[in-house]
């Protein structure tokens, strides 16, 4: 009787072990799947990519208008600015001066956009108002360095670095406004809790 009970007990132990192993196997597969999905999502969302401008020959009417304006802006006389971010990444922007001591708009484009096509209406408005304009390439975009977009985590410090550059270059008497579209707008807002120059007067945001 004792041997029979021991045999039954051993069988139960074996069954329980198998169940535990199956559960552990399922959990391991689930974790590996989640890690794979996370890695894919990170690479798709955050790793640097080279995005070409759409071909004018196949653009629809709206795209054609935006692109032709963007090409004009790109070719307008401007001053190319390169600064070093707080983590050593080289950042590039283009400064368009309309009037000395006028307010400076620092513009940040959206994720995987560029400072020209994302900026056409703003460029024309600042031109009419004779405000000076600094078009910034976000890190991991276009002319700027960096391999990863951090979706605003590090970019907000870059925003502060650009504001500091404008303040140092033109003096604290020149008003600065931070402006962005989509993720660029988020970058401008996220930078507002940092120690910005006193010449920064506000944020102007736009999102679709």
Predicted regions and their residues:
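Alpha/beta-hydrolase active-site loop
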Residues: 150-170
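An N-terminal hydrophobic leader/cap segment in hydrolases
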Residues: 30-83
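Conserved alpha/beta-hydrolase
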Residues: 126-145
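Short glycine-enriched nucleophile-adjacent loop
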Residues: 185-196
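Conserved small/polar residues in nucleotide/adenosyl-binding loops
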Residues: 206-207
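Short beta-strand element of the alpha/beta-hydrolase
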Residues: 102-110
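Alpha/beta-hydrolase fold nucleophile elbow
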Residues: 172-181
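The serine-hydrolase catalytic nucleophile loop
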Residues: 112-124
């Amino acid at each position: 009787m004792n041997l029979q009970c021991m045999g039954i007990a051993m069988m139960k132990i074996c069954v329980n072990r198998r169940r535990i192993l199956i559960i552990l196997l399922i959990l391991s597969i689930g974790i590996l799947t989640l890690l794979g999905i996370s890695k894919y999502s990170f690479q798709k969302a955050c790793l640097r990519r080279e995005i070409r401008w759409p071909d004018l020959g196949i653009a629809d009417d709206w795209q054609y208008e935006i692109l032709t304006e963007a090409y004009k802006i790109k070719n307008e006389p401007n001053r190319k600015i390169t600064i070093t971010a707080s983590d050593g990444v080289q950042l590039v922007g283009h400064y368009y001066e309309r009037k000395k001591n006028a307010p400076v708009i620092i513009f940040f484009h959206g994720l995987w956009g560029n400072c020209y096509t994302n900026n056409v209406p703003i460029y024309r408005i600042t031109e009419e108002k004779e405000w000076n304009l600094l078009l910034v390439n976000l890190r991991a975009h276009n002319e700027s360095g960096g391999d990863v977009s951090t979706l605003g985590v590090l970019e907000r410090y870059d925003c502060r670095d650009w504001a500091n550059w404008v303040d140092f270059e033109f003096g604290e008497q020149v008003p600065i406004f931070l402006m962005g579209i989509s993720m660029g707008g988020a970058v401008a807002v996220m930078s507002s809790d940092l120690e910005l120059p006193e010449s920064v007067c506000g944020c102007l945001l736009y999102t679709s």
